[in-house]
Amino acid sequence: MEKFIELSLKEVTAITGGKYYGNGVHCGKHSCTVDWGTAIGNIGNNAAANWATGGNAGWNK
């Protein structure tokens, strides 16, 4: 079992982090990185969705 400590609002706001886009891309203050294992899976899923819908997948309407 892991131990956790509760952070105060002041401590939480002092944390600097980046943004995760949900597709394997994570960007910090000065750079971005790609988790290719996740990204390739998303590329495959998007390709299959576009093929199955004739290019009319949800984000291409």
UniProtKB/Swiss-Prot annotation:
Pfam families, A to Z: Bacteriocin_II (PF01721)
Main location per the UniProt record: secreted
Keyword hit for Disulfide bond: yes
GO cellular component annotations of the record: extracellular region
Keywords attached to this entry: Antibiotic, Antimicrobial, Bacteriocin, Disulfide bond, Secreted
GO biological process, one term: defense response to bacterium
InterPro entries: Bacteriocin_IIa, Bacteriocin_IIa_CS, Bacteriocin_IIa_dom_sf
Propeptide: 1-18
Cystine residue pairs: C27-C32
Keyword Protein transport: no
Localization (cell): Secreted
Function of the protein: Bactericidal activity; inhibits closely related Lactobacilli, Listeria monocytogenes and ivanovvi, Enterococcus faecalis, Carnobacterium sp and Brocothrix thermosphacta.
Family named by the database record: Belongs to the bacteriocin class IIA/YGNGV family.
UniProt-recorded name of the protein: Bacteriocin sakacin-P
Biological classification of the source: Bacteria, Bacillati, Bacillota, Bacilli, Lactobacillales
Gene name linked to the record: sakP
